[in-house]
Amino acid sequence: MIIIIIVLGHFIGTKNPESLYLLVWLIIVERLNQLLKLIIKYIFGKKEIPLLGKGERPDEAKNCGYIANGKKPTSYGMPSGHSHTAAFFSVYSILVINSHPISEGIKTSLAIILTALAFWIMYSRTIFKCHTVQQVLMGGILGSIFGVIAFNLKNIVLQKIK
């Protein structure tokens, strides 16, 4: 949510079509995550599947929503939405940065920072017991895939807008 607010603010301030494109994709990724949770909940239910683990949030999950109220969230755990969004934003941003003619040192530094931030967010979801490792990994993998897709479609879409 914070990423969406920052990108929205940047778009309002600059009217940059690339910011609007990223904002739209962040909303798409958020909605896809909610759709995937519904589909996976229908398939998994309360079952635990080898390697994939369980789809429900851990029993210890509390304070995982926007408001820390000490209650277990009612949303399904698979895939982790935080991991999904963090991986998407990190991968997409790294690909965009690497496509610009700036020094390799800056590209590498930004890639390290973005990757570390995404991994920190994913790690925090397991430390706070909001998700299992499998739920976080699935969110990260899906977010990364959508980041690559969004980057590869960027020039096609932006050319049609301009």
Where are these regions (language model features)?
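Residue-level recognition of hydrophobic positions within alpha-helical transmembrane segments
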Residues: 27-29, 33, 78, 131
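Transmembrane alpha-helix/helix-exit interface in multi-pass inner-membrane proteins
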Residues: 30-51
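Hydrophobic membrane-targeting signal helices
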Residues: 12-13, 28-35, 98, 122-123, ...
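Membrane-embedded catalytic cores of phosphoryl/pyrophosphoryl-handling enzymes
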Residues: 55-162
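Short regulatory "switch" loops immediately downstream of catalytic or recognition motifs
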Residues: 8, 40-45, 94-100
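The first (N-terminal) embedded transmembrane alpha-helix
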Residues: 1-8
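Interfacial segments of alpha-helical transmembrane regions
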Residues: 8-32, 136
